[in-house]
């Protein structure tokens, strides 16, 4: 009784949390007919969803830190005691790996699937501190070219951890990223169609469909909102003088 009458006024862009997707069905065609771009992220049925890639909104080192903060805030670790230490350690590793992916990987590989491949390749041998896995070698090569590279600096801090501790950090990261390791989620985050950073530029309706009985993938909706608010606030301040058109 409240949402649909507001949507039907068609006076601005909208972001709608839409349990079960009924609002998108009832209002989507009207909005399309009136010149709106309509975007749908469907966490109930990924096959009926636009793609969402959080990596698509990274343009600077600051954006990398924001994405890592968003990831940590909206996902679950493995519940280790001393969570603050493990979160900080995870943050270092995510920052290093995402920095490497953003600056060194081809655009089509800048996504969570690649991040998971990196984590999976990070073998640690507790009895051999000199062992170097493929990720170590990749960062070693990058450091030889650009010793002050942002990702290299973060990775060196992570590598201060002893073998057993590093292994635990990797396990914590793997636990947090476990949902991204299912095929459907890898696919839906492979590239981006939501264009969150353009929401304030022209009339757009973004429907975020989520289950009201199963919270498994609600963290994706939370990540979208976190990135959306950051992106639009920055654009309002930097481009439009404090207010979106």
Predicted features and spans:
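P-loop NTPase motor domains
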Residues: 1-245
């Amino acid at each position: 009784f409240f949402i649909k009458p507001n949507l039907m006024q068609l006076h601005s862009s909208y972001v709608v949390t839409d349990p079960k997707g009924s609002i998108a069905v009832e209002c989507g065609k009207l909005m399309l007919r009136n010149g709106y771009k309509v975007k749908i992220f469907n966490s109930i049925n990924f096959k009926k969803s636009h793609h969402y890639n959080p990596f698509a909104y990274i343009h600077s080192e600051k954006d990398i830190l924001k994405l890592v903060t968003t990831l940590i805030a909206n996902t679950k670790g493995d519940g280790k005691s001393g969570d603050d230490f493990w979160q900080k350690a995870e943050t270092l590793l995510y920052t290093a790996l995402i920095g490497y992916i953003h600056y060194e990987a081809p655009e089509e590989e800048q996504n969570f699937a690649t991040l998971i491949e990196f984590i999976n390749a990070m073998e640690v041998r507790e009895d051999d501190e000199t062992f170097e896995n493929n990720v170590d070698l990749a960062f070693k090569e990058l450091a030889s070219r650009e010793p002050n590279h942002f990702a290299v600096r973060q990775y060196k801090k992570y590598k201060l951890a002893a073998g057993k501790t590093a292994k635990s950090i990797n396990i914590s990261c793997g636990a947090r990223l476990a949902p991204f390791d299912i095929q459907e989620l890898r696919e839906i985050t492979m590239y981006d169609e939501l264009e969150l950073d353009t929401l304030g530029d022209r009339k757009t309706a973004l429907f975020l469909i989520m289950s009201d009985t199963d919270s498994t993938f609600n963290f994706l909706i939370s990540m979208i909102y976190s990135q959306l608010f950051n992106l639009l606030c920055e654009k309002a301040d930097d481009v439009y003088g404090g207010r979106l058109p």
